[in-house]
Amino acid sequence: PVEYMYVFIFALFLRPAASAQVANLRSYMRDVLVAAVITAIVSAVFVACYKFINNFGDLLLANEIARDMNAANVMADNAQFLIVIGFYVMLMFIVDRIKDRPVQFGLCVFLLLFFANNQLFDPTRHSRMYAERSFFGLTTVALFQAGDDYVIRMIHGITTHGQQSQNPEKKLHPTAYYAPLKLFIKSIDRSVSHSPYAVMGLGAGTLACVGHKSQHVDFFEIDPVVIHMAENTKYFTYLKDCPTKSTVILGDGRLKIAEAKDHKYSFIVMDAFTSDAIPTHLITREALATYRQKITKNGFIAFNISNRHIDLRYVLAKLARNAGMNAILLHDDGTSDPLYFSSTWVVLTHDDHFYTKLSKYVTDSMYIKDLNELNTSSTSLWSDNFTNILETLKVLRNFREN
């Protein structure tokens, strides 16, 4: 998306219809200077107001005028929102006045988009504790309030990749999307329940706490920034304090897990998906064949498919049917605890009794479905040679079903 924005702005600089307005280098340089001055003035005033609002929010918290952290943040949010909108109105006025000057117009539109991207759509701007960018995008650590508890969350883009309660009694509880995993583990055969397990996608390291003391977990993580944050005990202590021993392996999860011994893991958790990007190479026929080789006879592979825009149920059901496996969906609406999120999981297993065993543990906030009943005749069988992300879009799926 960032690249598209740059192309759009570049196109604004080169509008043929307005080329007559900038006939020589002096005109271009004058336009650049004017746009630079506008940018400098607006940025300086904006940053000053931004810092004032942030300091005002901190002052509210420090003096306990607003004891609820969210209340202080909402007040700061509202004030900052008005400031941002005010600047947008001013910028739109400027843009309208210079719409026939490509350089001025392009630079001012860039400023507008920059503020929109970094201020209006940044949910962590008041509570951010740390942020770092890598090849895979911006990852942020921020403090939030969840019910009566405070939590530290790891956020990549707009997707939460784990959180940890600051309540000592709940500090090692698997929260966020991971409540259903406890039920999956209860449903596994006791004979393999103490075998090692694997997780693709480290996040905050939450899943180190779903195993037993005698177990070992291998985390596969492709982003070194995520590893750095998860191992920093200033923010998250799962890897340090959870009873399960853990190893973090840097690299592409599919390639790295292929190096493990066959039938090593009692289960594999696929938690590498976000709303912004779906690593389709992790959910192909060939990838599933690799995972099947690495789990025990009646182990399982759990896919976290929680997503605003993408529905992977049919793709996974098709893959399971092709591999002779059972596919089970479990949705948790997240209402049983303020620390839980709404989440959707699909489990693939060779255990024909897994659905029956899992059904015994399903709570009122959960919904379970046997995906073997889905009609997947119109769904593509994803492979390393072919995937079709369009068929997974929820808006298209809902349109076809209605």
What does each of the following model-derived ranges do?
Residues 370-371, 375:
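Extracellular/surface-exposed low-complexity segments
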Residues 1-365, 377, 384-402:
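Alpha-helical transmembrane segments of multi-pass membrane proteins
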